[in-house]
């Protein structure tokens, strides 16, 4: 078993729902934080984030919804989030144009090297 500490950024270019992270099929991810920033100079933007549970017919569970004020950031997962193989995180924002950006910090537990 290998544990790799990683970061992955995202930008919301449109207003549709976007998958910003998918846990690999041979691993488990422990998400430490998902920082989300509104880079707009003057307007608040509504942001939604969902956990997509691959073991439950890809049912989506909202874990974050907030009107982010202009030029602010927030940790959308202050208690962390655990993802199993195939689980995903989606983001949707009321405004596109890369105004909403973020960073996912996580530990990826790779099980491909296990015996048995």
Question: How would you label these PLM feature ranges?
Answer:
Residues 48-52, 103-105:
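Beta-strand signatures of extracellular beta-sandwich domains
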Residues 38-46, 94-100:
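Extended, low-complexity, turn-rich repeat/linker tracts enriched in Gly/Pro/Ser/Thr and Asp/Glu
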Residues 55-88, 94:
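Intrinsically disordered, low-complexity Pro/Gly/Ser/Thr-rich segments with frequent PxxP/GP/PP motifs
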Residues 29-38, 88-91:
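A short beta-strand element within beta-rich, extracytoplasmic domains
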Residues 45-50, 58:
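A short, structured beta-strand/loop element
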Residues 37, 50-54, 92:
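A generic structural motif
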